[in-house]
Amino acid sequence: MDVAVALLARRDYGREQLKSRLLDKGFESPEVEQTLDTLEAKGFIDDQRFAAALLRSHIAKAHGPGKVRQALMQKGLNKQCIEQVLDASDCDWFALARSRALKKFGDSPADGMKEKARRIRHLMGQGFSYDQVAYALEYDPYD
């Protein structure tokens, strides 16, 4: 338990991440589960809090909901926890996509289809949906 608390003293971990770290250090699985249950009961481990902190970090980096969702899943958080945190978020993803586009490309319009496609690919690669990208670039596909 001391090792787990020492790890948590440095930074926040999700349950699965901490479990992985402890197993890597050579602790037995039943002992790790018991320690994690104790730490969770005492409030040292909270996946919701961990997910919310990661969400804030990704929003600060102007990542879209798709990229945030993928990053949270890689940290070992379950889908229900991820969706709860994303739903509870008061982030305006459309405005975030627009600010990301302005920062990356400036206020100048795209010159030609090749440049438009490059901008769309960039924003979609940052986790924004097509609707959010179209809004950010003021792009009408029927134009």
Language model segments and positions:
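An alpha-helical, amphipathic repeat domain used for nucleic-acid recognition
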Residues: 1-143
